[in-house]
Amino acid sequence: MWLSVALLTLLDGALAAPARQHSGAFDMPLTWTPFGFTTDAIQIGTPPQPLVCFVDWTWIGQYAFTPRCHGGSQGTYACLQHGQPLYNETESRTFANQSVLYPERTWNPNHFFFYNDLSVGFGSDIERVGPDHQARVTLQLADMHFQLDMVYPFGGVYGLSPVFKSDNASTQSPFYQMWQQGVYRSPLVSFVYCHNSTFDQPTPRRELCHGKDGLQTLGGPSPVLSLSDKNNSSPILWYDNIVFPPVNEIEFVYQPAVYNYWALRLTRHLIGDEEQALNTSIGGNPGAIFDHASYGRGVPMSENSYRRLIEITGGRPVVLDANVAPNNGNQSFVSVDCEKVSSFPNVKYVFEGHDRVWEVTPANYVERREVDGKEVCVLNVRTLGEGDWIIGNFGETFAKDKVVLFDFDKLRVGLADVPAAAY
């Protein structure tokens, strides 16, 4: 795209990552993996044990693989595969056992291991995030009751779920725990995705994500927003978070139930200018869950709106292996004419609280894939539920040209456009 002289002048001093404007924040670089985004910025214990963590907007604490297996630490590899990254509390002189304060907990089913137990004990230790942020936090210490069938490319889960008033430290995000101790001055976290271009459309520059795939800012708004000027502002629209119980029945099924999600109500869903029906039979407008892990891949649609998009785009059924499919949803996939993608309609959403229409362009919801040695363009759509819209996940596909923010104090979700100067 052509840049105006004024914009070129603005960019002249902005090609490096912008200077941090909010003291006390940390811009945590993220690496894309098939599971979701991970970070290598976390260490736990004394001396510090590096722990690559999966960053999860839908989990309620700092989870860590440990040597524990069936309640003991002697038979670790009867549960874990050799080479599995983990945190070993016996090697930390600052570890404190919290088993009396918080008894062991088990979820079954769960969305980690499904119908195998997700069992954790509790302890606290010093967690370091980046070079300058550290505090004692409560940890969820994995106690495996079965053998993992693979080595996971991370040793823990850094949860960023909202924290409710009734929650104690056993189900609190490690970010929230540190913010409560004054380590971060702001209760905000924010995300920007420096993704690869599929159809040569502009994408946020990699240096804005410190050369990585994404940036999860802890303790403030994304520094990308500081690139806006007075004539090209990118205001944040804030939406009040809701509790949406059907999420534990339709999507992330846990027993005991988990309801800590960044969630909004959807008031409109459109394909181009064509309104799509919403299912309002569950006590109001349907739900929108924010999740940038693998379950947030694909533009969220209902079964019926996906069927309509297939009609509009002339989609044809295509069979994709799991390692080729653009997302892990249960819906079927269709191929479309790569030459016609620019003519496809935007997929649109309106959330309760504002009339702003948020859009996903066809260049962001169509993916190129190789099938039998040939390039195929595939609709990257993920559906949940049956019939009209009842629930959907808003993650990396939705966020390709947006900044997503969460406010842990006021329990709000914020959305903003990525400023033009970031491209």
From Swiss-Prot:
UniProt entry keywords in alphabetical sequence: Aspartyl protease, Disulfide bond, Glycoprotein, Hydrolase, Protease, Signal
Glycosylation, residue list: N88, N97, N168, N196, N231, N279, N330
Induction trigger: Expression is positively regulated by the cluster-specific transcription factor pytR.
Enzyme class name: hydrolase
Cleaved signal peptide residues: 1-16
Phenotype upon loss of function: Abolishes the production of most pyranterreones, but accumulates pyranterreones 7 and 8.
Positions annotated as active site in the UniProt record: D56, D291
Disulfide bonds listed in the record: C338-C377
EC number: 3.4.23.-
Role description: Aspartic protease-like protein; part of the gene cluster that mediates the biosynthesis of pyranterreones, a family of antioxidative compounds. The first step of pyranonigrins biosynthesis is performed by the hybrid PKS-NRPS synthetase pytA that condenses 4 malonyl-CoA units ato the acetyl starter unit by the modular PKS of pytA. The acyl chain is then connected to an L-serine through the amide bond by the modular NRPS of pytA. A tetramic acid is formed and released from the PKS-NRPS pytA to give pyranterreone 5 with the help of the thioesterase pytI.
The protein's name in its UniProt record: Aspartic protease-like protein pytH
Organism of origin: Aspergillus terreus (strain NIH 2624 / FGSC A1156)
Protein's gene: pytH
